[in-house]
From Swiss-Prot:
In the presence of PdxS, forms a dodecamer of heterodimers. Only shows activity in the heterodimer. It comes from Pyrobaculum arsenaticum (strain DSM 13514 / JCM 11321 / PZ6). This is Pyridoxal 5'-phosphate synthase subunit PdxT. NCBIfam families: PLP_synth_Pdx2. Belongs to the glutaminase PdxT/SNO family. Signal peptide: none annotated. The gene is pdxT.
Amino acid sequence: MKVGVLALQGDVEEHLEAFRRAAAELNISAEAVRVKRADQLDGLSALAIPGGESTTIGKLAQRLGILDRLRTVVESGVPTLATCAGAVLLAKEVRDSVVGPTGQPLLAVLNAAVVRNAYGRQRDSFEANVDVEGIGTVRAVFIRAPIFAKTWPPARAIAHVDHPRAGRAIVAVRQDHVLATAFHPELTTTAFHKAVLEMAAGRL
């Protein structure tokens, strides 16, 4: 199978490597490729949308003519992992913890409301062990992370974190074939990439 990583910004190399390691661990034959153009989305069995800065990613995708095609691919049922700013890009409702509504380009395919920069600035980044439904306990790295303020069906919360500033917050969501995280699993684990590959292989 061929799996793609949106390569406009963020931890592209880390996602590619996580897919390669996940495939090896599952004994699945998979080619991990960078996606920068709409035509490179054709024939993908799975997709990852990395973090970075969600407004920049959305505007770049729009300028490159890839935003609408991305939406179509995700809506068509291609198993998708979206991390941090990638999760923001997927959400139907987005606001910033400081400036409020953002008006940024969105895919708007995930039934979730997201608050950007919910934990503060870069210096407020942190790590925590997180129990994720269906995946297990993972070490999660939160870098200028968002939170999911709410979800509605068919999306559901699959992980929470208790934080002194943000309180008890949803930090991972699943909606059918989509996994979205507020943190960066590509930095610490292959668990989420394995889950997406297993969806693509019809195992999960």
